[in-house]
């Protein structure tokens, strides 16, 4: 058929550093290079080479507040017969606040930029954020509520969207 053979080999080399600064700031950061080569065929999928990195930070400025920051650049698989994969860059930030042992608030934001490898269209940026509240009734039961926003900007109006979601629930922990 016309579907390409997706067999490939991938090599990724990274070096990194892990740290703990005064038991308040923890982190792991790596940087490297990756390459993926597809077998010679018709249609040919484009080989991919790119800078890669992964950053994870956790900061506890107080015993009630935690800030998490993550960044990643990599290549993910795709099922498209025209595209070798999506090169993506992702960043997230989340803040947890625990004013009492029974109450948790989380605010988070994220953004991801996708760049399909092998075509000039299809770039997309997805972004979003959420607010979460959880009240723990006891060791097994809690009540949660979340408001989330997500959106996508692309050069194709069919694939762009914006949405707001609201959810509430009761959680049983086994």
What residue spans do the PLM features occupy?
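Repeated loop/turn-to-beta-strand initiation elements of outer-membrane beta-barrel proteins
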Residues: 23-29, 63-69, 101-107, 135-147
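C-terminal structural cap/anchor segments
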Residues: 67-116
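Residue-level signature of outer-membrane beta-barrel architecture
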Residues: 15-19, 23, 59, 97, ...
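Acidic, glycine-rich loop-and-beta core segments that form the ion-binding/anion-interacting portion
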Residues: 1-54, 58
